[in-house]
Amino acid sequence: MKFTLVATVLLTFSLSAFAVEYPVLTTASPDQVGFDSQKLHRLDGWIQNQIDAGYPSINLLVIKDNHIVLQKAWGYAKKYDGSTLLAHPILATTNTMYDLASNTKMYATNFALQKLVYEGKIDVNDLVSKYIPDFKDMPGDKIKGKDKLRIIDILHHVAGFPADPQYPNKNVAGKLFSQSKSTTLEMIKKTPLEYQPGSKHIYSDVDYMILGFIIESITAMPLDRYVETTIYKPLGLKHTVFNPLMKGFTPPQIAATELHGNTRDGVIHFPNIRTNTLWGQVHDEKAWYSMGGVSGHAGLFSDTHDIAVLMQVMLNGGGYGNVKLFDDKTVAQFTRRSPEDATFGLGWRVNGNASMTPTFGVLASPQTYGHTGWTGTLTSIDPVNHMAIVILGNRPHSPVANPKVNPNVFVSGLLPAATYGWIVDQIYGSLK
C-alpha cells in the first residue's frame, strides 16, 4: 500500500515536471519589444480623425513577443438610435464587446475543429455525409458531387456552395426559405451547388454553417455550449459568447451595429425582419433568423483582450498557460496554404499574394494568417514576427451611403479606416 502511494506520487510529479506551460500575455511598453513608441502612437491621431469623420468606433490591441504593447479604444459603442444621433452617445472602452461577424468562423468553428482533429475525433478527409445524414445530391441538381464532399473541401471553400443563399429572406431564398435551425439544415442539404467542387474557391457562409452542424454532431452539444465550456472557460475568457443578452450581458457592454435592423435604412423587407437599432444581437441575417443566433459562420461576440488570448494560443502552437487545446502540427495543418489558392488555409485566410494587401498590409510576413468580419473586425497573426493584431469595430453603425444604389455600403465603409491594411502597416512601420 505504501509502495503504491509512493509510486503514484512519483508518477504525478514526473508528469507535472514534463507538463507544457505555454506563454501567457503580459503588458510591456512598445519600446521594450522593438517598437518606436512615438511612431506607434501616431496612429492615435489618425484613428481619432476617422472617428471625427464618422467611423463609429475602433478597438485595437497589438501583441508582440507574448506582450500586449498597445490596447486602446476610440469612438462610440452606440451613437445612434435609429437615424437620430444620441445627445449622450455611449463611449467605447477597451472592455466593449463586438459582434465578430465572420471572425466567428475562426475563433469558434476553427478552434473547435482544430481541437477535435487533435483529439482524433474527426479527420479533415472525412466525408461530410459521415456526420450529416442524407447529405447528397437532390433529384434535378445540375451539378453533382455533394455525397463526395469532404470536410477539407468545406474548409478550403471549394465545395461548390453559393456565397450567400439568404435563407431568411423569402423574396430571395424562395423554396430554400428558413427561419428555424432545424429547417435550415434541411435547406442547406437542398441548396444546389453553383460550381463543380474543387474547380475554384468561393468564400461561402454555407460552408461554415455546415461545419457548425458537424461539430454539434460530433460533440452532441450545441456549438455555443461546446466552445464556451471546453475552450473559452478553460482559457479564462469572460467576454466571448454567442447571444450575449441571454448570458448575463447588457446592451451598454456591447457595440451597436445597424441603425434600422437589417433593413439597410428601409430598402430591404422580409418576414420578421428587425427594424430597431441592433444592440447585443448578431447582425448577420442567417445567424439570427435562420440559426437562432448561434452558427458556425457568425454570431460570436468578444472583446480585444479575449481575442488576444486566442491569437496567442495560435502563436504558442495550441495552448495558453497550462491549457492545451491542440498542438503545433494542428496549427501548421490549418494555416498551410491551399495548393489552388495561396490566400486560403483551412478556413484561415493567408497572406499568400498581393490580393490580401487590403487585409494584412504590405509589411506583414507572407506567413501571416487571420480573418475579417463584415461588421469591421480583423485578426492578423504573424508567426514570423511573433506578433498579432486585433481590430474590432462596428462599421454598420452609421447610415447607408445610398440605399437604392447599394444597400450594403455604409457611410463609414467609405472611410480609410474601413481598410484594415493601412492600420496594420502603420503598426509594422513602427518597428525599429
From Swiss-Prot:
SUPFAM superfamilies: beta-lactamase/transpeptidase-like. It catalyses: Preferential cleavage: (Ac)2-L-Lys-D-Ala-|-D-Ala. Also transpeptidation of peptidyl-alanyl moieties that are N-acyl substituents of D-alanine. InterPro entries: Beta-lactam-related, Beta-lactam/transpept-like, Diverse_Enzym_Activities, Pept_S12_YfeW/YbbE-like. GO terms for biological process: proteolysis. Its EC number is 3.4.16.4. It comes from the Bacteria. One of its GO terms (cellular component) is plasma membrane. Pfam families: Beta-lactamase (PF00144). The chain crosses the membrane at residues 7-25. The keyword Chaperone does not apply. Keywords: Carboxypeptidase, Cell inner membrane, Cell membrane, Hydrolase, Membrane, Protease, Transmembrane, Transmembrane helix. It is found in: Cell inner membrane. GO terms for molecular function: serine-type D-Ala-D-Ala carboxypeptidase activity. Its main location: membrane. It is a single-pass membrane protein. It is an enzyme of class 3 (hydrolase). Gene3D superfamilies: DD-peptidase/beta-lactamase superfamily (3.40.710.10). Belongs to the peptidase S12 family. YfeW subfamily. PANTHER family: BETA-LACTAMASE-RELATED, BETA-LACTAMASE-RELATED DOMAIN-CONTAINING PROTEIN. HAMAP family: S12_YfeW. This is Putative D-alanyl-D-alanine carboxypeptidase. It comes from Salmonella agona (strain SL483). The lineage of its organism: Bacteria, Pseudomonadati, Pseudomonadota, Gammaproteobacteria, Enterobacterales. The gene is yfeW.
